[in-house]
Amino acid sequence: MEIGKVPENVLKRAVFKQIRHRREEVILHPGVGEDCSAVAVGEDEALVFSTDPITGTDKGIGNLAVHITANDLASSGAEPIGIMTTIILPDGTREIKLRRIMEEIETACSKLKIEVMGGHTEISDAVNRPIINVTGVGKVKKGKLVSTGGLKPGDEIVMTKWAGLEGTSIIAAEKEEKLLETLPRELVDVAKGFKEYLSVIPESKIAMEVGVSAMHDVTEGGVFGALWE
């Protein structure tokens, strides 16, 4: 298989066909484009869970990891509550690197009013750069839970912000020196600053108020990939 998202046909054959639904409390199940699952708690509330790794960059990795997972939760209609983090660092990583990653994570969580609830941290020769996986939890009324599969014929499709926003901010941070050889500093700084627009929580709240039928956080695959999912 090639680098990137596992193809849909492989997901269906190798992943989804192996999974069986056996708990009635689980009310949102695995599927193509479904980034969350949900568990019913009580009569009218559900806890929503999502998990995502950051593997493509180590610049601002803590900030990215928090926002990507929180966005998945928000796209299901949930209010993000907290996260658990798994941080795997390559052999020889200095303590200051770990501290900076955690500072990024805590800063992002503070802005979103969510909490770091725990996690796991280790040094491993299995990786050659930092890898973070974040599992997030949020809450939503069961009747307000939004699935990617809720899209209906005739629905209007609305995209917020800009295509390529996250990728542009990553490239600008990763390749800053190279870009400055041909582009003005002001332009590169604007591109790096796109990281401040990563959260979709404000938009999801507005969408919920007007009765949205489906939401999806666009990541790998771009706009067309997200619509296909």
Task: Indicate residue ranges for each PLM-predicted region.
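Helix-biased detector of long, well-ordered alpha-helical tracts
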Residues: 1-229
